[in-house]
Design a protein with these regions (language model features):
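FMN-binding flavodoxin-like domain, especially the glycine-rich phosphate-binding loop
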Residues: 1-3, 9-35, 40-143
Length: 143
C-alpha cells in the first residue's frame, strides 16, 4: 500500500497514517505537501493499493493537491479516498477527489470523510483526530 497525502497542518497526514498503517503496517508514505521538494511521478500497478488523503478548504480539494495527484497513475489500481475537513462541511471534495483519481487509472473501493482540527480557526475540532476518532478510523480500516 502507498499512503499519499497533502497535509499542510498535519491533520490529514495523521488521519491517513491511522487508516493506512492499520490496513498495512508496511505501507509507504508519499508526502506531496512540500512545494520545495521535487515532486516525483509515480506509476502504481493493479497489485498495489493507493490510500490518498487531502484536506478540504472551502468545500474543495486544494488545486495544488489536485495538480500533484495528477503525477500519480494507476492501472485499475484500487484506491481508498480520504478527505479531511475542519468540522464545517466537505461539500463536493470527495467527488472531486474521486473524479481526479479515477481519471488517473484508479478504481475507488472505499471513501471516508474525517474531521481534523480546523486549519485556520483552531478552536473548531480542536485536537482532532483524537483517540475516539482513531478508534473509528481503525474500525473503518478493518472493513
Amino acid at each position: 500500500m502507498h499512503i499519499v497525502y497533502f497535509s499542510p497542518t498535519g491533520g490529514t497526514r495523521k488521519a491517513a497514517y491511522i487508516i493506512g498503517k492499520e490496513i498495512d503496517p508496511q505501507a509507504t508514505e508519499i508526502d506531496i505537501t512540500d512545494h520545495t521538494r521535487q515532486q516525483n511521478s509515480y506509476d502504481l500497478n493493479g497489485e498495489d493499493t493507493l490510500l490518498v488523503a487531502v484536506p478540504v478548504y472551502g468545500g474543495r480539494v486544494p488545486s495544488v493537491a489536485i495538480d500533484r495527484l495528477k503525477r500519480i497513475t494507476g492501472h485499475n489500481t484500487p484506491a481508498i479516498l480520504v478527505v479531511v475537513y475542519g468540522n464545517r462541511d466537505y461539500d463536493d471534495a470527495l467527488l472531486e477527489l474521486k473524479t481526479t483519481i479515477e481519471s488517473n487509472g484508479f478504481q475507488t473501493v472505499a471513501c471516508i470523510a474525517c474531521i481534523a482540527e480546523h486549519s485556520i480557526m483552531r478552536v473548531y475540532a480542536k485536537g482532532r483526530p483524537d483517540s475516539d476518532d482513531e478508534t473509528i478510523l481503525k474500525n473503518f480500516s478493518e472493513q
